[in-house]
A protein has these predicted regions:
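Membrane-interface loop-to-helix entry segments
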Residues: 107-109
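Acidic/histidine-rich catalytic neighborhood of metal-dependent amide-processing enzymes
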Residues: 111-163
């Protein structure tokens, strides 16, 4: 990554900090356990609906692939985040605590997803400066074996990815 591009990307990410927090809190309030992330997957796909990218379902689970500059020659880089919650009761009084009894985000997948959504948005904004393509991988069911990754890999999530 050249220093100028990196600086622009970091500035954009800084400019979107409040959006990252808002997305993370929404996701934290609406966790779903592995292989039942239907609403989360819909939320993720809806986020991309007005952005200049190609979105598709991936795997026989709720996996999502987002391609930026899919036909541009050069390396294909990938970023990945998981988005399932855990079957744990959240016991606190935070204004954004889980609204789903017995399910919570206890290990950061809400944050991973929020950050990846905004990273993708910023990369789309800078897409003309990218020498190649970007693949964004939203993986469900990371908390159980074999999880959603295997299904996504079999359905081509990593096909053509260089790094």
């Amino acid at each position: 990554m050249n220093p100028s591009f990196e600086s622009k990307l970091m500035t954009l990410l800084d400019d979107h900090q409040s959006e990252i927090i808002e997305l993370r809190r929404y996701l934290h309030e609406h966790p779903e356990v592995s292989f039942h992330e239907k609403n989360t997957a819909t939320f993720i796909k809806d986020y991309y609906s007005n952005l200049d990218c190609k979105v598709r379902d991936c795997g026989d689970c709720y996996g999502i692939i987002v391609d930026i500059n899919p036909d541009k020659p050069g390396k294909k880089l990938a970023w990945r985040a998981d988005f399932d919650g855990l079957a744990i009761q959240e016991d606190n009084d935070l204004p954004f605590k889980s609204q789903n009894p017995g399910v919570m985000h206890a290990c950061g997948h809400d944050g991973h997803t929020a950050y990846l959504l905004v990273l993708a948005k910023c990369l789309i904004e800078l897409k003309d400066e990218i020498n190649g393509s970007i693949r964004i991988i939203h993986q469900p069911a990371e908390e159980v074996a074999p999880g959603g990754a295997l299904s996504m890999i079999k359905d081509g999530a990593l096909d053509g990815v260089d790094d």
